[in-house]
């Protein structure tokens, strides 16, 4: 895997290699790895922000899609890149934190040591949703139903070890509901299964179900964090629980060892893009909220989430 990733990283760097003997950074194109397929919400976000960053730095930002292994391939490419500021990535916590804990053979990196945080870019809440005609109309009723009907409440997620699966496990720990996580190969199959009556709930990124929520086909039960378009949907904290659900966050990173002066040029340009009102307006309909957080706070969040995910994974028997 590392040999393969190294070869791909080499081809990526050649494609966007800066002029030799550059006097000041940046003097050439910067490659932006997008570890997901074209058309994904992260891809749309990355391309919108790349245009803004290019204007700020006055050099081209070249988006390069490198999907595969749930985003892990793109992250590993970054870890193989030279720490010169000419290769960065926009990646989410599913590939950075969750996969590195659950599948270290494929996700052969440590998000705490193998990357240089450059700034949080955006968040998308996770939502627990049920069909609009479900007999449980709120979180309390859902938990009561699950306890009275052990093993009967199946909850679809986007895959094994996904953010949604860990949300289900968090709810089970907090309430004793005994919800059964059912992994699908992505969000769309899970939504289809719920609408078709094959499962009783889903936990997915909010943006994947907003249309169904507005039509009444689905009903939201709880969110990982507040979202302005659905102000009445509660969070776990508002329901009296101390452990929040996991949301989805996306952030910019460079390779480990990125020089401070290079990061000092990148960070303000990325911050400008993340705080752009035009970009925020473009992404909001996708269920994405732009939110800037500086590198030190981003690293602290990664440490905390890494600890939580690892703890749940061990208690659930997912890892030793």
Model-based region annotation:
Residues 27-29, 237-238, 260-320:
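An extracytoplasmic/periplasmic, membrane-proximal ligand-sensing/linker region
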Residues 30, 77-86, 101-189, 236, ...:
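Hinge/capping helix and adjacent helix->loop/strand transition within the periplasmic-binding protein
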Residues 41-45, 49, 70, 74, ...:
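Stable alpha-helical elements in mature extracytoplasmic
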């Amino acid at each position: 895997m590392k040999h393969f990733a190294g070869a791909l990283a080499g081809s990526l760097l050649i494609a966007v290699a800066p002029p030799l003997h550059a006097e000041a950074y940046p003097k050439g194109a910067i490659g932006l790895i997008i570890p997901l397929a074209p058309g994904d919400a992260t891809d749309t976000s990355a391309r919108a922000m790349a245009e803004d960053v290019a204007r700020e730095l006055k050099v081209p930002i070249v988006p390069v899609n490198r999907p595969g292994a749930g985003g892990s391939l793109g992250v590993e490419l970054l870890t193989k890149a030279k720490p010169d500021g000419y290769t960065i990535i926009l990646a989410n916590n599913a590939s950075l934190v969750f996969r590195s804990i659950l599948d270290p053979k494929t996700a052969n990196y440590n998000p705490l040591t193998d990357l240089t945080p450059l700034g949080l870019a955006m968040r998308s809440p996770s939502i627990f949703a049920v069909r609009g005609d479900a007999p449980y109309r709120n979180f309390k009723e859902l938990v009561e139903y699950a306890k009275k009907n052990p093993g009967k409440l199946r909850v679809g997620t986007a895959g094994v070890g996904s953010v949604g699966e860990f949300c289900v496990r968090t709810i089970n720990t907090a309430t004793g509901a005994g919800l059964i996580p059912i992994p699908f190969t992505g969000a769309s199959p899970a939504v289809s299964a719920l609408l078709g009556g094959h499962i009783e709930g889903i936990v997915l990124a909010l943006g994947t179900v907003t249309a169904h929520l507005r039509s009444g086909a689905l009903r939201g039960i709880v969110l990982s964090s507040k979202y302005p378009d659905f102000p009445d949907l509660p969070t776990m904290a508002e329901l009296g629980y101390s452990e929040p659900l996991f949301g989805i966050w996306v952030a910019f990173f460079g390779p480990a060892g990125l020089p401070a002066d290079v990061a000092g040029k990148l960070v303000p340009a990325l911050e400008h893009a993340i705080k752009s009102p035009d970009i925020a307006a473009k992404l909001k309909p996708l269920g994405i909220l732009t939110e800037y957080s500086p590198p030190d706070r981003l690293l602290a969040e990664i440490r905390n989430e890494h600890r939580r995910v690892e703890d749940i994974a061990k208690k659930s028997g997912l890892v030793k």
